[in-house]
Amino acid sequence: MSKHIIQEDYILNYMIYDDVLNNRDIDPYSDSKFRPIKNMTSKRKGRFFEQLTEEYVDHLGWKVSKPENSDHDTIINGKKVEIKGSFRWVVDGQLTHYRWQQIRPSQDYEYMVFLALDPRKCEFYCGTKQEVSDFVTIQDSNGNYPYNQHGGMTMNSGTYRIDGFPKDFPFMKSLDQLAV
């Protein structure tokens, strides 16, 4: 018999055991206050992102109004705003990229707000509709639409998605663009 043994009762003294019990070894969000939001359905999560943004800018003293139609989510300081949120994806227990989806340049909005959530924070970014549209609608040298969301890259469905980090997108600037 080996002299190097961990008895069953002593496994409780090891941090990795607690990590496994609480899924921290495979889920960076396991002890995050953002986890309940991450686990919501897409529709509910989207509504949460909209309400969080409205409440956040209201705390800044900005004016929030109801949308004029279903093509935008809210009006902030008189500007029509569409809101997109993403949690950092987890692959093999590691945090990877963000993915913002359902970007539709044909809709009636002036600005797009992007929420970037990871286990410890939620950051807000903002871009003009024109900047976002110019970026996502590009056609590459092979005739593909690299940001197209539906139907593959060879077609232009009018709905786009972007993967990466805010620093990867020149249009993701300060939320202060909406400040009057």
Language model regions located:
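Nucleic-acid endonuclease domains
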Residues: 1-79, 84-180
